[in-house]
Amino acid sequence: MMRLRGSGMLRDLLLRSPAGVSATLRRAQPLVTLCRRPRGGGRPAAGPAAAARLHPWWGGGGWPAEPLARGLSSSPSEILQELGKGSTHPQPGVSPPAAPAAPGPKDGPGETDAFGNSEGKELVASGENKIKQGLLPSLEDLLFYTIAEGQEKIPVHKFITALKSTGLRTSDPRLKECMDMLRLTLQTTSDGVMLDKDLFKKCVQSNIVLLTQAFRRKFVIPDFMSFTSHIDELYESAKKQSGGKVADYIPQLAKFSPDLWGVSVCTVDGQRHSTGDTKVPFCLQSCVKPLKYAIAVNDLGTEYVHRYVGKEPSGLRFNKLFLNEDDKPHNPMVNAGAIVVTSLIKQGVNNAEKFDYVMQFLNKMAGNEYVGFSNATFQSERESGDRNFAIGYYLKEKKCFPEGTDMVGILDFYFQLCSIEVTCESASVMAATLANGGFCPITGERVLSPEAVRNTLSLMHSCGMYDFSGQFAFHVGLPAKSGVAGGILLVVPNVMGMMCWSPPLDKMGNSVKGIHFCHDLVSLCNFHNYDNLRHFAKKLDPRREGGDQRVKSVINLLFAAYTGDVSALRRFALSAMDMEQRDYDSRTALHVAAAEGHVEVVKFLLEACKVNPFPKDRWNNTPMDEALHFGHHDVFKILQEYQVQYTPQGDSDNGKENQTVHKNLDGLL
């Protein structure tokens, strides 16, 4: 089954014509098909009769209960205030096209579906027809039952708490329609803090694909709550670090308290976490160097940019008046290289237009979160920038600038870019855009080319931490860039971006707490560029469920079958768990349910999850043998009848996980 990673698939669909979208969706897996609205209008939903029949299976249990999110109340006024945070983002959320799609071309006789088999087309068409007839539940129904835990209504605060436990925020632009509808519902209904199924479906239908991904734990960090607890522990450990000195060469930097300390995380799927002083604005300073280099390469290409600047670490202080053997700055991360890169951006226009252009670019990278400007810092930098003026004149004498460049004007622009303000939260989204191949994770917009991202990360890895770059690459092994304001922009490629900020600096000019945090992070998690992902078992890998989790999943599955907890089994199936997992005696959940005589569990496993009714344990006993041995004749009869209908599924090239998702979700739907 295709995995919906981020919003790439939706972006692709939205760029196509209606006919193209229809053809694509009909060839896709049922998960995507069910997100479409019927051609006759309305939305896919189970009819009342079907809902009544399905309620014993779908109605109980659901998403695990979580404590209320920080600062979240169940009162209507405070929930409205919480939901109101999403209204500041002008970017609309990514959602499936609402217009009816035109019929696409028919599949040829030799075509296969998204699962690599020719039966997928019939499954999709059959599922689509049944949904139109109200015989099967929609994804919105499944999501409702997942969260409701057997209740007829969902408290709004419970939905928001469950949403936050996945790492998504109510302010996420991709959830704008959902949050707007929730806000409207709270204002217009008498029972504003409770959502029945119809109201819930109305609220989530525009963003159902993203929400389904979130609640099925299909984001890059599946267990985000556990991961953030580790981040908080590392934060507290680094907070104890003393020493270092706040930069004081200009008064605007010296005014910051040495006790300020914040860490923000944003994954490539838009999962967010912040701890500490993450909303305090500070200047990017040298952290802007990789960003403006990325802009230059994105606009002009690698070959043109590197006519003027090299790619090698200099081995010297970042502000030395020194060029390489070709009379070019060594790299874009030293002051000389950054000044030259600044001269390449939007040549031929005045500084005001250049500055607006870069600000708009950085706003896109930050997903329209806070990006500001400190005029006081700019004025102070210009007044105390004698060394940078000396570097500028040296570069001019060596003809390092493009022809016709106004060197003094370029230095003004350079000081302006150093004075751009961010918060830890907005800068973490910028870092996540670099981690995500140039796509902003919270808007889905492509901001940078893959070439620009690759080159930027390479230079951050080798030259980003001043004179500490070699040691940082050795010990931490991740692309990063530090600044004199105390920030460290850290990128874990294909996983997440982070901003660590604490003003006290070590003798190399890097944040003391930030360096300590980065070391601890890589000691705990296998994020180092050269950690062996397959054999390095001593480190935590937040990107996948570990061995302990797999053991727990078998225990939880068999225990739910033993106790007859259909609600838990439904939740496991929705999370794409393998419902045919075996214990050390090769016994499955169906063995246990048959031995205990749980009719509803047996029906659920057979009819909804489509498990194999013939599995044999270590003693060659099948579930039918278990039912007969313990005298559960009703279960024996069900198994006997189902064996006639069962068709074994062969192996496919898509892997066991895709088969599991196909069986579970397609069976559930």
UniProtKB/Swiss-Prot annotation:
The modification N6-succinyllysine is found at K130, K164. This is Glutaminase kidney isoform, mitochondrial. The lineage of its organism: Eukaryota, Metazoa, Chordata, Craniata, Vertebrata. Isoform 1 and isoform 3 are activated by phosphate. Inhibited by BPTES. BPTES binds between subunits and favors dissociation of the tetramer into dimers. Inhibited by 6-diazo-5-oxo-L-norleucine (DON). Enzyme activity is stimulated by phosphorylation. Homotetramer, dimer of dimers. The tetramers can assemble into rod-like oligomers (in vitro), but the physiological significance of this is not clear. Interacts with RAF1 and MAP2K2. Interacts with ATCAY; the interaction is direct and may control GLS localization, negatively regulating its activity. Residues 68-118, 647-669 are annotated as: Disordered. It catalyses: L-glutamine + H2O = L-glutamate + NH4(+). Residues 653-669 have a biased composition (Basic and acidic residues). Catalyzes the first reaction in the primary pathway for the renal catabolism of glutamine. Plays a role in maintaining acid-base homeostasis. Regulates the levels of the neurotransmitter glutamate, the main excitatory neurotransmitter in the brain. Pfam families: Ank_2, EF-hand_14, Glutaminase. Residues 1-54 form a transit peptide. Belongs to the glutaminase family. Residues 93-103 have a biased composition (Pro residues). Substrate binds at S286, N335, E381, N388, Y414, Y466, V484. SUPFAM superfamilies: Ankyrin repeat (SSF48403), beta-lactamase/transpeptidase-like (SSF56601). Keywords: Acetylation, ANK repeat, Cataract, Cytoplasm, Disease variant, Epilepsy, Hydrolase, Mitochondrion, Phosphoprotein, Repeat, Transit peptide.
